[in-house]
Amino acid sequence: MSNLAATTADDQLRKLIPPQAECFPDGVQQGEIKVLFTGEAETRVALESAARLAGRLNSRVSLLVLQAVPRPLEPDRCPVSIEFLRGRMLELAASVDAEVEVQICLCRDKVEVLLRAFGIPSLVVMGGRKSWWPGRKTRLGQALERLGHKVIYIER
């Protein structure tokens, strides 16, 4: 990771959760930081930030991967090999200095799965690129915020 990316991510974390903080923000599930897969490079930066934060807050990190299955296919017939996807995600998780649990969810509607996967308000870290136009990733984050989750956006 470049120093610029690390500084940007660290600065963003400091704004949201001060360095002296030793506990989770009020109203969110304690003990777990959830990272939503938003692309390989973006998620790597988010995982690195979540790992640093997890070290401070004595918590674990979970990586949630939402894999869409198109309508013509049966829900359990993923167009991507699950073994391949799991291998890539485990590789990505192993690249950070923290134990990361990987969860892969096959779905038709990502927002619907987020409703079920994040039942209790959670601390969620999402990686992305800075953009003036809200994209799919931003809309997913906004949907989580509407449900009461605390979302931290980490720019790549």
Describe each PLM feature range:
Residues 78-92, 135-145:
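Short, aromatic/basic amphipathic alpha-helical patches
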Residues 1-27, 95-124, 130-131, 140-151:
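Structural beta-alpha unit
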Residues 36-40, 105, 126-131, 156:
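Structural motif
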Residues 2-16, 22-23, 52, 63-87:
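Acidic, proline/glycine-rich short linear motifs
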Residues 23-76, 146-147:
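Small/aliphatic-rich secondary-structure junction motif
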Residues 54-57, 88-98:
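Short helix-loop-beta junction
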